[in-house]
Structures are given as C-alpha cells and as structure tokens.
Amino acid sequence: MSDSKKPTPEKSKYPVNLLDTPFPMRGDLPKREPLWVKQWQDKQLYKKIRAARKGAKKFILHDGPPYANGDLHIGHAVNKILKDMVIKARGLTGLDAVYVPGWDCHGMPIEIQIEKQFGKGLPVKEVQEKARAYATGQIARQKADFERLGVLGDWADPYLTMNFRNEADEVRALGKILEKGYVFRGLKPVNWCFDCGSALAEAEVEYADRTDLSIDVGFPFADIDALASAFHVGADVLKAKPGWIVIWTTTPWTIPSNQALNLHPEIEYALVDTSRGLLIVAKERVEACLQSWKLEGTVLATCEGAALNGVRFHHPLAKMDAGYDRTSPVYLGDYVTIDTGTGIVHSAPAYGVEDFQSCKAHNMPDSEIINPVMGNGVYASTLPLFGGQMIWDANPKIVEVLRESGNLFDAHKYAHSYMHCWRHKTPIIYRATSQWFAGMDVQPNDGNATLRETALAGIDATAFYPSWGKQRLHNMIANRPDWTLSRQRQWGVPMAFFVHKETGALHPRTPELLEQVAQRIEKSGIEAWQTLDPRELLGDEADMYEKNRDTLDVWFDSGTTHWHVIRGSHAADLYDASADLPDGRLADLYLEGSDQHRGWFHSSLLTASMLYGKPPYKGLLTHGFTVDGEGRKMSKSIGNTIAPQEIANKMGAEIIRLWVASTDYSGELAISDEILKRVVEGYRRIRNTLRFLLANLTDYDHAKHALPTEQWLEIDRYAVALTDALQKEVLSHYDVYEFHPVVAKLQTFCSEDLGGFYLDVLKDRLYTTAPDSVARRSAQNALYHITQAMLHWMAPFLSFTAEEAWQVFAHGTEHTDTIFTSTYYNAPVPQGASALLEKWAAIRNVRGEVTKQLEALRIDGKIGSSLQAEVTVSAGESVHDALASLGDDLRFVLITSAAKLERAPEGGDLLITVVPSTHSKCERCWHYRADVGHDHAHPTLCKRCTDNLFGSGEQRSAA
C-alpha cells in the first residue's frame, strides 16, 4: 500500500492487519526520561550490567574529574555523554565496561567560595572543613544533573580526590617520586597570580589581549675599553659623546630588577652615531629604530654579539637613586631575535624563565637575584623610588623617571596577547619563588631515562583520537619547564615535609615520615596535617624542623588518580594485574576536551612516567569545545550560553545526546536553537521508524513464527543482508570511537533504506496478506532482526528511547529488563548476501526513476497516489533479468497497480512509461485492478483480497 492515509479497519467489513503498539508516537521526553532515571536508580542498573558481564574482559574508561563547583554547562554534558556512549558501545560487545565517575575537590575556586561566605582569616583547619562540606554539596547537585542526562556509572560510589583514602595515597605518591629522585626545591620564576597569591600550573594560564606600555630604554656605556675593542674603534670615539645600548620591553615594571643584557652571539650589532649620542642596536634594526626615535644616524662600526660578551653597561636608573648604582653585563642567548625591538633583551632573572636560565648559567647565586615584587604584586617598601606601589600602577611612573634620567628613547601603548589567570581573568607574571619541582631533565636515582624522555616515549606508545593530538602533546612535553608541584594554598593535599629550620634540608627519614602522615590522613583527612604536633613523629628533633606549609598542585591531585583511584580506592573494580606488564596500561581510555593536552592528559602522563615508567592510558580521545551557531565561544557576557538542564527540561536529554552523537567531536561542536530543532526532526524520523517496526511485530512471537531464511521472500532476505552489512560498518565506527557516522548511517537507513524503500514496499504485504501467511510472517521475520539490530546500534546514544522500545520488543525474553545486559545482535545472514545487495541496488535504481515519473504525473494532476498508475519498464539485459526475476511482484516493489517489463534493444537506455490506470479501485488494498468485482458477493474487492480474506491466500515470492 502507498504511504498515504491508511484505511481504518473498524469502519470496513474487509479488515486489514493494522496493529497498534504501546510505544507511542510522541516521545514526551522531558516527562518520561526522569521516570527512566528513577527506574534505573531503583533497579541499580549499572550494577546489574556489571553482574551480567562478570568474568568478561574489562574495558576501563577512567573519568577525568570535573571540578566540584558550580552548575553543569554544555561542555560538561558533551564530555559525560561521550564517555557514556563509549562505555555503552563497548559494553554491548560483551566487555565488562567499567565507569567510575569522579570529582576534583581541592583548590582555589572552593577557597574563594569559602572566603566569600565566611570572610578571610579563618584558621586553616576550619577552611578545610568548610571547603569539604561545600564540595560535598556541589557534587550532589552535579551528580543529579549527570544522571538526568542518562549517563550510567557507579554513581553510588564515585571517587573524590578529597576522600581520606585518596588524599593519603596522594601523599604516598609524592613520597614515591621523591624517593625516585625527581623532586627538588629551588628558586625559579613560576607563573604567579596576585589574586590567588600562589604559583599557577601551565594549564591554569590562558592568554588574552592586553594593552601595555612599550618602552625603548638606553643603558649608558660603562666599559669603554671593552666596547672599543669589540667594535675596533678608538676609545676617544666612544668618549666623545654619551652612548647607550638600547633595549625594548613591554614590562617597564621589570626595569628596577634588571641584572643583565642578552644578545645573540651570531647577530651583527651596529655602533651608530646620532645627534643624541652613540647607540648600539642590531644592525638589521638600525633603520626601523632610528625612524621610531626620529633620529638620523651613521653606522660607525659593527661586530657580532659574541664580541660583546661580558661587556658592562650602567643601569638606566643609576643617576636617579644610588640604589641602582650597578652595572649589567652582556650574556649571550640563542633565543634573542630581531623580528621586533632592538635585538637586545633586558634581563630581570626574577621575572623571566630565559632571563633566569641565562643568569644561572653565568653562576649568579640565588641570593643575588633581585626580587622586589611581593606575592600580592606590590613592590617591597625597600625598593628605591617605587617601593609600596602595585607594579601595574608603577609602570607610567617608571617611564617618567626614565624620561627624567635622559635614558628613555620611546614610550607608547602596545596591544599584545598576555598571560592571565584562568580563574580571575587578571594578568599574571613570572616571579621567582622558592618552590618544589618535579625535574623534567633530572636523572632519577635508578639511572634510567629522565622524566621528559620517558614521557615522550610513552606518547609514541599511545593511540590518539584524533591522531593530531599526538604531535600536540609531544610538543608540549618536549618544551615544558620543570613542573612546579607546590602551591601556597589552604584547601589542598599537603606536601607533608619536615624542613630543617637552618639548612632547608628535608628530614633524612622523609619517606618514612610521609607514610606516617599518610596513615593519619587516611583516618581523618588532610586536616590531620594541620593538627599534627611535630613531636609526635620527630621527638626531640622537633625543635630543629618546621612543617612545610605548601600544598600540592591540584593537577597532581587529578594527575595521580591512576595511582590513588585505579590502584587505590577503586582497585576492586578498576585494577587489573595485567596493567603491570611492560606493555600493560591501567586504563584503556582517557577522554577529555582538547585543553587537557596541557591539563589532565599531561599531568597524568608525567606522574605515571615517574611512578611506573609508562603512561597510564592506552588511548587518548580529545573533543572540541562548544560554540554557538555562528561559531562563537560560549560566553555569559555575549548571552549565547545554553544550559543542558534547560534543554533536558524543554526537549529532553535524548536530544542533547543525539546532538552530541551526530556532531564530529574532533572539531568545535556548534549548538543553537536552530541546530537543536534539526536534531529533534532527526529524532522523530528514528522514533517513527521504530514505532512502525514495533507495531507490525505486535502479533509476532519469534519462538513460534520464526522461519528459516530460505523461506523468506527475496526482498526480506535483501533487507536483512543490508542490515548485516550496515552493522559491520556501525561496529567498525564504534571500535574507533566514531559516533557521528553511526548517526548519519542510522538516519539514512531509517529514511531511505527502510522508510523510503523497504517499509514502503512492505506495507501492502503486512496489511493485506493473511495474518499467519508465509508472506506476512516472512516480513515479520525480517522486521524482527532489523529492529533488534537497530535498537542496539542506537542504544549508546539514544539510550532512553532504545530502552523504552526494548521493553516493548523484548517482552518475555531473558534480557527483558534492559537492553544494556544484552549484546549486539547478529541476524541470520541469508545465503548469497553480496549478490542480493548488488541485485537489489540495481532494482532500487529503477524504482527511483519510476518514482520520478510518477511524481511528474502527480504534479500534472493525472494521478493522486502511485497506485492509480500502471508502468512499463524497458531495460537492458542485466537490469531486465533482475526485474524479471520478481515476476508479478514487480508492481509491489514499484508501488503501482500494474507493471509490465520489456527488454530494451541492445545498448538501449532504461525507458519508463507511466499511464493512469483505467480500472476500478479495490476498497481494501486500494490497487486499481481489472478483477475488482469478479466475486459478486464482494463487488468492491479485487481477486487478491478475496483470496487473502476468504480463500487460501495469495502467493508471493519476491516482495
């Protein structure tokens, strides 16, 4: 029958097989989904799935913990849904797919919340207690929202980095890497946020545009004889005029701390005579610099930077205050460039990594490094001229003093990309502080490879999805500085060291003491370190040592979850001894946003490399960020954010899930109201297809009605062969964590293969043949296998809908309770499947051409439905033979009342002729047939319908 209005059986004395199903047309997702969530919670579905997979090989997706603060945003939803789809897709293969969700609980954002609620100045122990309570409340809210999205996991026992066992094991991990020789203390410039009052991890730094003062500053000549020798000029030439070596900087606030100048050894530098005096700049920058300073000049001499090594120049503020009466030597550095500026870099070792490395390479002791900027961004009161001022406020004042000194050549505003704290969105600096580090290039005590070498080798042994992630992470590890492990915070796991008050050395029994502290933390949390009296562990030595007050970087918290979760708190579920084999890994997959190449992926790799000498994961999957329909980043200030809770309440979580699954996560994920409307339309097509399948299986019992494949009609064999071929593609996509091709192919299958062809052809047979006929049962056999396969394909992403349909479909089977304890369904593949696929592809091409002709006739008003038409097809040999094999069933495939087939002349094209039928319409099947009224007892029926209702039934062979 055509896909137009169906006859209503109750009004006809000639009924058709129109069945109903409890699976409704409308999903009513916002109302029904919470009921499913409640049902899954009540029946402990995750545990039930795990029990069904007992003894199977485990698949471990280790959860990168979200931070326990604030409401979920759409990025959280993307991440958790992707993880859920991976777990479900793997579980349906029969693996024991384990997912223990977790939360990152320590750190500055929660400290800030406690400060907002209770004010500053609370005792540390009280801050920790209140932070713990706050995080617990935040976790409860987020957990409910994650479950609402249909995400299955061990929500009853998630891992929390603030659980006592996890905190204790983190201290133990610190002890391990200390024993191995990776940890050291030193003065180094680190990313420093004034608002946090602490060092920042690399992953806590973001870049934003900022306008600063850019200045060109002259350092007056001091070592005339050395300069004369370098440039091969007479000393009298240099004494005849004032002279400067000129630097360019965008950080005027660092000038008071200048201690050296950096030149490239191989760049040529020019001595230039100008009306203002003698100047030294890179030869290639002379023209640009003179133009900028509105000077004319002549190059007197040149020399390579190497010739100026060690030459000294006066500090530009020396004339303004005796506190700056010092000279700055030239040090050579390969990092100096001549793209901008003067080709000379001023070096303040306390405030730049390369500056620091350069000065340390020239044996500058820590005690001589000038470091007047305090942790809050204010100069120490002892700094001449600028003491007590905030560095940003001091910038213009420094410029004025330099101008007054006669050493300023230029000052103007300069827009550039600059480091900011990701939490406070405020500018940060490099600041030399005494910190604890994990050394990237330190030789460990066992004499094996350095941390950098081990981590880079681990990257090569890791699978990346998408593949470009490998090079990205490689570059980050290859170029990163030592890891600053210490933080100056309160709500964090302590670096529980006892440090000698005079020498700063660690207690010689530190590994043993760390274990004793860990045992206390395991009983009562990190608060135990605050209340611990050193005498309890050190006895009479206590007066010689003090407790280290630093806490561990929160990236060490989450970066060691492979140690304190997989091997620790949740080892019973997550740990497999095979992970300890040389090629073994603790987790099959880590899955996070692309920012985690410098975050969790990064810290986890470093900690595992130190602890085990290899990565903790077999594979890394990276997804992009969410943007709006115009490609803009989600931002509250723009007003383009979309809350997942609102979508779930308005459209259903299933729509979010389908959106995530249908989007290529390797790039940006665009979302908008318009995009979601299209997702809803796609969902309806899938749901309507399911409803049709389930309705037409209402009176089908596979145990009673299954037929051997050789008894199926040919088109049914084709449909199942097509389903099997598609399943192979679907599973191959799932195997490499690809979801959007699965959705695209499922939608094509529903709309084109099923709705646009097979089901359209099938309706006549399903509705009009005898209920228990082979023709109808053959169709139902095919529908049964198609439905079962299809429900499993969609279960990873359309979890609510698949489960709802499964309750209808699988009633009375061993897996009635849930689809998720079953596995992907392998339908019986008919013999000669590949030949069937090829043959029916040709038949469908012909049908497509016939449909075009029918549509043209319909537009002309000559027919209404396609059943009002009769068609003649003239085809070449191979196509003719394929069509001829269908016999009279060809008309059912073309959905016309009659179909005639002719053989085209050799080499002739496909020719289709369509004409309106001149016959009467059968009341029951709506076909226009010459035999309507052949039986006077049933004048409105065709012969086929009288046979199906009152006789032995029609015979079908192909369709």
Curated annotation (Swiss-Prot):
ATP binds at K636. Binds 1 zinc ion per subunit. A motif ('HIGH' region) lies at residues 66-76. PROSITE patterns: AA_TRNA_LIGASE_I. It is an enzyme of class 6 (ligase). Gene3D superfamilies: 1.10.730.20, HUPs (3.40.50.620), Valyl/Leucyl/Isoleucyl-tRNA synthetase, editing domain (3.90.740.10). One of its GO terms (biological process) is isoleucyl-tRNA aminoacylation. Pfam families: Anticodon_1, tRNA-synt_1, zf-FPG_IleRS. CDD domains: Anticodon_Ia_Ile_BEm, IleRS_core. Its EC number is 6.1.1.5. It comes from the Bacteria. Zn(2+) binds at C922, C925, C942, C945. Its cofactor is Zn(2+). A motif ('KMSKS' region) lies at residues 633-637. L-isoleucyl-5'-AMP binds at E592. Monomer. Belongs to the class-I aminoacyl-tRNA synthetase family. IleS type 1 subfamily. Catalyzes the attachment of isoleucine to tRNA(Ile). As IleRS can inadvertently accommodate and process structurally similar amino acids such as valine, to avoid such errors it has two additional distinct tRNA(Ile)-dependent editing activities. One activity is designated as 'pretransfer' editing and involves the hydrolysis of activated Val-AMP. The other activity is designated 'posttransfer' editing and involves deacylation of mischarged Val-tRNA(Ile). This is Isoleucine--tRNA ligase. It comes from Ralstonia pickettii (strain 12J). The gene is ileS.
